[in-house]
Every structure is written in structure tokens, then in C-alpha cells.
Curated annotation (Swiss-Prot):
The active site is at K116. InterPro entries: BRCT_dom, BRCT_dom_sf, DisA/LigA_HHH, DNA_ligase, DNA_ligase_AS, DNA_ligase_CS, DNAligase_adenylation, DNAligase_N. NAD(+) binds at D34, A35, E36, Y37, D38, S83, L84, E114, R137, E171, K287, K311. One of its GO terms (cellular component) is cytosol. HAMAP family: DNA_ligase_A. The keyword NAD applies. Its EC number is 6.5.1.2. This is DNA ligase.
């Protein structure tokens, strides 16, 4: 492989893995299987090792996790919640053992093996035995404050058996029986069901209303002690015993092993026992038990050297493929999906499986009526692995992708260097509908109450066809729709009205310009400050911006060189939709003498003008430090709407409190 090709492939893999990380760790909405993610990661690691000149500090191969959403308050972990390196077979486990023994110069080593619970990783903070704060893992450094929701989980003690100050870490999960019951209720109510227990747990814990989490019958296993004051515990196994004595729920199926052979035997044992548990596990975690040896081995930027996660092979089952259904995405890509005779895979009933594209169907010679092997290695629609040719009867039908769009009957095209067929009709109803769903999504205009179901209702009723149509909706129209009452209709109209005040970057991202993600949208918004200035920009001006490449620049210029788009922007203006950047430029804050220099600040509640992540960046650019909890060392609390318990903590510690208006005044000095 030439250096040029290697560089291009490395960049492609980084973009791909960053997208997968964001979908999995931030949105709780993964789009690929664990196996596919791992394949791409291993390819990237190999290419970077072979081409060290292309190594980058921000490569997915060396960093932890993704970005945190501006929904809950931010919490900075006192020590990073690192991810673990992976082992996929016995050889990987033996390599891990060899590295450990080399790193400790022949000292005796004992391992502790634990079941890897498939849930949501959280940290729990206790002061003098009282539960004061819980947070998600987030990107490993900064998580989200989910204290109130965690308090609804009965397995989490609100008061410990000793008045000790500590941070424990664990995995919140939904038992299988609770998952089945929840999905049955959602089906009866006509709601979308959860794909699996992990998604159900994550979705429940990240609800803004703790009452919803309380109804979901979640549980939790604590798997580690991050720190504890005035106490030294020499081994991980003893720390788990200590946590159990304090009142935490720890998993009883852990085992200490003196040799790697014992570790391998434990892995094989639980691979067999796995289906009989009432909770999902996706592997085994193996750790060096001795804490002193852990400290000696240390960590890499991404994971500890003293621990590894063995990942179970994807579960594979056989079922019959009864048909192939096509869907059209917002960019026009036509994706085939296999329709299957229902079969249980990895704890859920599966009726559909991804076929990705026409090339895959041809490569695997998939035909309607075939018996196929299906696997589900992660949290997504499963994939067809292969056909069982021995079961063919001769009655199976070969499948050919259509030449015309299934939604609008326009001719399909295959763009250069793409394997997917694409509908390029800008009036295709399927693309319009998917585009509307994207426009109102969390990272775009973030219109609460406008999800896929409601957008589909509005679209089918012919109430909306363009983004601007959303701002012409009336309460009377909503009341004509199923499951809308006076209150819900009023709330949705208000949510749509509120979205008019969003900063420019949200609108830009919502437009769905090809190649422009949320990060690029913010870059454009901060650089040009208004939509009008961006519309006038040339390709050369766009390419001159840091991190904006030729492909993206061309896409932006092409998008705005369209009369329909310009008409849409004019309609936005008429409806009063903001098209200016409301943020404060980071670059303008550098080297400025500021009140915030050397100050410790806590942000709480909803900030209307900027998200808390942006406020944090501004404070840090001015020399301040942002923390997630109020203490006697805190200098200032900035309180937005619906500020919670941190106000009481500020009063207790006699800390000054500002509202958002006062905060912005100080920033703008």
C-alpha cells in the first residue's frame, strides 16, 4: 500500500470511528456492531503502526470516548474513567499475561476475573457515608450528573454502613425480565421498543424526569473503588469485599486466578453459563489484583495496562430470509434490509437484519427464501453473516436492486467511489421526511416532543414539507393528530417557538448539508457569525478555515447555490428564526485579563444563550477552572434555569451566585 493510499485510509477510519464513538457513547444510538467497530479499530491501529508519520494525538486509537451532550450538568471525574483494551481469543489473553509479567519483573501476579455487565458505566460519590452525586462515564474525563435518576435505583445505597468518603464505580443495568415487561408495555402503547437491555438502561437513566427511571426497575453492580479517604486497600478483591460490607451490590460470580490457564477456564465457563443469567454480559474483565502492581504497570492514554476485557464472540443463529425491504435516508442512500422469520438473538427477538448495500448481497449470494446465519454483536439491527447453501431447495429467488427509487420512482445513481445507490431527486418524500427528523433532532434544532413518530404524522397529514413549514404549524393542526391533546399541542408549539432562538450552528447542522457535521457547523458559525456571510463565502474562503477540506467546502458552496435553499432562508427570516452565532469566540478570550483567572466555577441549570460545554470552554480560556460540585474551594456558581441542589450547596459554603445575564456581562467585558 502506498503512503498516499495509507494516509487516505487512516483518515477515513478516524472519521468513521469518531462517528461510531459519538453514536455509541454520546447518543446511546449505535449504528454498527461491536465486531464491525473492532475490525475498523484494529485496521487503524495496524496502519498507524506501519505509518508512524501519520500518527495523530487525537486519533480514536489513543483517546477515550466521545463528547457529552448539553442536557445534564457536567461532572469532571477526579480520576479518568478509562476504557479497557480488548481480547478476542486465547492468544490475546496470553499476550496480556506476558505483557503483565514483563512489566512487573517476575513478581508473583494474581488475577481477578469479573463478568462484564452490558449496561451503563457510572461513578458514585459519597461523603461521610452519604450519596451526594452520580455521573455517567461520558468521554472518560467529563460525564453527566444523573444523581436524581440514580437515587431511584434500589441497589444503590443512599447511606453506607460506615461514614466514609469515597468514589465507587459500577454498571447500571436492566434485568432481562424487566426489559421484556417494559417492551411489552411500549408495544401496547404504540411506542418504539428498545433494541436491548443496555439501550433500555441507558435511555432510562438519561431521562430528565426521575419518575420515569423509577418505573424501569433498574439495578446496579459496583465493580470498583476509584478512591477512598483515610484507607488503604491492598487488592482489588479486598476492595470489592469492602464495598459489599458498606452495602453496595457487587457481582458474586467473580473469581481470583493464580494463572492465565485459570483465567481462560473462567472465560470458557461463563461463555457457557451466560444465557442463564437474568442480566446481559458481553465479556469478562480480567484485572491484576494487587493494587501496588497496578500502579507499577500504569496506564496508556486510553486504557490501564493492568486490565483487559475479553469480548465474547458474536452470537450466531439460523433463520429464514423472507424478503428484502428498501429504505431511503435523508441523503438519498437506498439501503436494503433483510426481513427474517422472527428469531431470538442475544436476548432480543430479531425480525430484520442489515444488508448494507447491493455489493454485499451479490458477494454473499443472498437470495429471498435462503436460510441465513444472523449475528448481533452489539446494539443495532443485526447483520446477515452468510447463507447456508446446503439448505437451498432451488426455489429461492435472486434479488436485484431496483433501478428507481422506491419512494419517488426517480432513477437511482451510483456516485463515483461509492458502493451505495442514491436517489438524487431533491423532492423525494422519503428524503424530505428523514431530513425533517434530522432537523428537529437533539444536536440540531432540539425541538422537544418532535420525534420520528410526530414528524411522520405531520408529513402524512401534509402539514409539513420543508423545514420552514414547522414554524407555520398551528395548535389546531396538531389537535387533529392522533394522541395530541390541548396540553401536548400547546407544549409542542411553544417548543417550536423556543427553537427560533437557537444559535446559528444548530440551524446549520439541522439543514443537513452533506459532509457538514455538528463540529463543522460550529466552526462555520463562529467564523462567519451570520448566515448571510456564510452564504456569500467562496470555496477558497471556506478552505482557508482550519479543518475545512475541499470536499466540505465544495458541498457548502453547492448547497447555497440553489434558489430553493435561498427561499428557505428567506422564510426562516420571516418566521423570526435566528441566523446569527450567539456564542463568544474562544480566540477573542485568549490573553485577556479576566475575573475568571484562577477562579473555580460551578455551572448549574440550563443556560439559554450558550450550552454549559461552551461556557466551560470560555471560562477555561480566561484562566478559570470548571468543576462539577460545590465545595468550600468554589469561588463562583453560575445558575441558569432550573438550578438544583447546587444552589443550596453554594449557600452552605457561602459561595457567590450569578445568573446567566451577570455571567455574560462579565464575559463580554
Amino acid at each position: 500500500m502506498s503512503k498516499e493510499i495509507a494516509k487516505k485510509r487512516i483518515e477515513e477510519l478516524r472519521d468513521l470511528l469518531n462517528t461510531f464513538n459519538y453514536q455509541y457513547h454520546v447518543l446511546d444510538n449505535p449504528s454498527v456492531s461491536d465486531a464491525e467497530y473492532d475490525r475498523n479499530m484494529q485496521e487503524l491501529i495496524k496502519l498507524e503502526a506501519e505509518n508512524p508519520e501519520f500518527m495523530s494525538e487525537d486519533s480514536p486509537s489513543v483517546r477515550v470516548g466521545g463528547t457529552v451532550l448539553d442536557i445534564f450538568e457536567k461532572v469532571t471525574h477526579k480520576s479518568p474513567m478509562l476504557s479497557l483494551g480488548n481480547a478476542f481469543n486465547e492468544g490475546d489473553l496470553r499476550d496480556f499475561d506476558r505483557r503483565v509479567r514483563q512489566g512487573i519483573d517476575g513478581a508473583n501476579v494474581r488475577y481477578i476475573c469479573e463478568l462484564k455487565i452490558d449496561g451503563l458505566a457510572v461513578s458514585l460519590h459519597y461523603e461521610k457515608g452519604r450519596f451526594i452525586q452520580g455521573a455517567t462515564r461520558g468521554d472518560g474525563v467529563t460525564g453527566e450528573d444523573i444523581t436524581q435518576n440514580l437515587k431511584t435505583i434500589k441497589a444503590i445505597p443512599l447511606r453506607l454502613n460506615e461514614e466514609v468518603t469515597l468514589e465507587a464505580r459500577g454498571e447500571a443495568y436492566m434485568p432481562k425480565r424487566s426489559f421484556v415487561k417494559l417492551n411489552e408495555e411500549k408495544e401496547q402503547n404504540g411506542e418504539d421498543v428498545f433494541a436491548n437491555p443496555r439501550n433500555a438502561a441507558a435511555g432510562s437513566i438519561r431521562q430528565l424526569d426521575p419518575k420515569i427511571a423509577a418505573k424501569r426497575n433498574l439495578s446496579m453492580f459496583v465493580y470498583g473503588l476509584a478512591n477512598v479517604e483515610e484507607k488503604t486497600i491492598p487488592s482489588h478483591s479486598e476492595s470489592l469485599d469492602f464495598l459489599g460490607e458498606l452495602g453496595f451490590k457487587t457481582n458474586p460470580n467473580r473469581r481470583t486466578c493464580e494463572t492465565i490457564e485459570e483465567v481462560i477456564a473462567y472465560v470458557e465457563e461463563w461463555q457457557e453459563k451466560r444465557p442463564h443469567l437474568d442480566y446481559e454480559i458481553d465479556g469478562i474483565v480480567i484485572k491484576v489484583d494487587d493494587v501496588a502492581l497496578q500502579e507499577s504497570l500504569g496506564t496508556t492514554a486510553k486504557s490501564p495496562r493492568w486490565a483487559i476485557a475479553y469480548k465474547f464472540p458474536a452470537e450466531e443463529v439460523v433463520t429464514r430470509l423472507t424478503g428484502i425491504e428498501l429504505s431511503v435516508g435523508r441523503t438519498g442512500v437506498v439501503t436494503p434490509t433483510a426481513e427474517l422469520e422472527p428469531v431470538r438473538v442475544a436476548g432480543t427477538i430479531v425480525r430484520r437484519a442489515s444488508l448494507h448495500n447491493e455489493d454485499l448481497i451479490r458477494e454473499k449470494d443472498i437470495r429471498i427464501g435462503d436460510y441465513v446465519v444472523v449475528k448481533k454483536a452489539g446494539d443495532i439491527i443485526p447483520e446477515v453473516v452468510n447463507v447456508i447453501f446446503d439448505k437451498r431447495t432451488g426455489e429461492e429467488e435472486e434479488y436485484r436492486m431496483p433501478t428507481h427509487c422506491p419512494a419517488c420512482e426517480s432513477e437511482l445513481v451510483r456516485l463515483e467511489e461509492e458502493v451505495a445507490l442514491r436517489c438524487i431527486n431533491p423532492t423525494c418524500p422519503a428524503q424530505i421526511r428523514e431530513g425533517l427528523i434530522h432537523f428537529v433532532s437533539r444536536n440540531a434544532m432540539n425541538i422537544d416532543g418532535l420525534g420520528e413518530r410526530v414528524i411522520t404524522q405531520l408529513f402524512d397529514a401534509d402539514y409539513i414539507r420543508t423545514f420552514a413549514d414547522l414554524y407555520a404549524l398551528t395548535k389546531e393542526q396538531l389537535l387533529q393528530l392522533e394522541r395530541f391533546g390541548e396540553k401536548s399541542a400547546t407544549n409542542l408549539i411553544q417548543a417550536i417557538e423556543n427553537s427560533k432562538e437557537n444559535s446559528l450552528e444548530r440551524l446549520l447542522f439541522g439543514l443537513g448539508i452533506r459532509h457538514v457535521g455538528a463540529k463543522a457547523a460550529r466552526t462555520f458559525a463562529e467564523h462567519f457569525e451570520t448566515m448571510d456571510e456564510l452564504v456569500k463565502a467562496t470555496e477558497e474562503e471556506l478552505k482557508a478555515i482550519n479543518e475545512i477540506g475541499e470536499k466540505m467546502a465544495q458541498s457548502v458552496v453547492t448547497y447555497f447555490d440553489n434558489e430553493d435553499v435561498l427561499e428557505l432562508l428567506q422564510q426562516f427570516k420571516e418566521y423570526g428564526v435566528n441566523m446569527k452565532y450567539k456564542g463568544i469566540k474562544i480566540a477573542d478570550l485568549q490573553n485577556v485579563e479576566s475575573y475568571f483567572a484562577g477562579k473555580t466555577v460551578v455551572l448549574t441549570g440550563k443556560l439559554e444563550v450558550m450550552g454549559r460545554s461552551e461556557a466551560k470552554k470560555k471560562i477555561e480560556a480566561l484562566g478559570g477552572k470548571v468543576t462539577g460540585s460545590v465545595s468550600k474551594s468554589t469561588d463562583l456558581v453560575v445558575a441558569g434555569e432550573a438550578a438544583g441542589s447546587k444552589l443550596a450547596q453554594a449557600e452552605k459554603h457561602n459561595v457567590e451566585v450569578w445568573n446567566e445575564e451577570r455571567f455574560l456581562q462579565e464575559l463580554n467585558k
